[in-house]
Design a protein with these regions (language model features):
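Hydrophobic/small residue at the entry helix of a nucleotide-binding pocket
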Residues: 161-163
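Single conserved hydrophobic/aromatic residue that forms the stacking wall/gate
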Residues: 1-9
């Protein structure tokens, strides 16, 4: 899907950790979007969230129970609730939210058990202004720095493994790369040239478009 089908919003609350919210404006392929985001340098993790309006604690508890019911068919799991607030005038503090939601979850799903050390389900509840985000899955991102934040470099791309790996590692540090390949027929074949082109395409999945000179 085109990125124009999504709305991006930036946030820097909750302790200063930067967040970018991606809201779908049309139907999309979930796996395709997650796969694309896991190849974007600068992203540490991707969290698919259910975002609701703040309509009081009872509504929040019902939404959490509904979320768990849909997300986990097997309820014989251990869990922990981790609530965080940017709106400090919320009528309950984070610890109270954790305990109250935990109690509601145990009432709804008696087979679930609390484990605050190594839970199988870490339920995150983030109260941000007038909205609340609920999630329990975090897909690891590649980390690194966003492409273009550390200048440009030229990559000497050959048909071996070292040069594409070097290109990947440099791009992960925020460097925008172009590639150069020395094609010297008859000493290098068209097959060798095509291999370099294919390697450039693989690296470009992470680095963005690469001009191959």
């Amino acid at each position: 899907r085109s990125v124009s089908a999504f709305l991006l919003n930036r946030s820097s609350d909750l302790g200063g950790y930067g967040r970018i919210y991606v809201n779908a404006l049309s139907d999309y392929d979930y796996d395709e979007v997650i796969d694309s985001l896991t190849r974007v340098f600068g992203i540490v993790g991707i969290c698919p969230v259910v975002q609701i309006e703040d309509n009081g604690f009872d509504d929040l508890a019902n939404q959490v129970i509904n979320y768990l019911d849909k997300a986990y068919k097997n309820k014989n799991l251990t869990f922990k609730v981790n609530a965080r607030r940017t709106r400090k005038n919320y009528p309950m503090n984070s610890m109270e939210i954790n305990m109250e939601l935990g109690g509601r979850i145990l009432d709804a799903f008696p087979e679930m058990k609390v484990d605050v050390h190594k839970p199988e389900v870490l339920l995150q509840v983030e109260i941000r202004g007038d909205v609340i985000n609920i999630y329990s899955i975090e897909v690891p991102g590649p980390g690194g720095m966003p492409i273009g934040t550390a200048g440009k470099a030229m990559l000497l791309l050959s048909g071996g493994i070292d040069s594409p790996v070097a290109g990947y590692m440099v791009a992960k540090r925020g460097v925008q790369i172009e590639a150069t390949y020395f094609h010297a027929p008859p000493y290098t074949s068209e097959r060798a040239k095509q291999k370099v082109i294919d390697l450039a395409k693989i690296v470009s999945k992470y680095s963005g478009p690469i001009t191959l000179n």
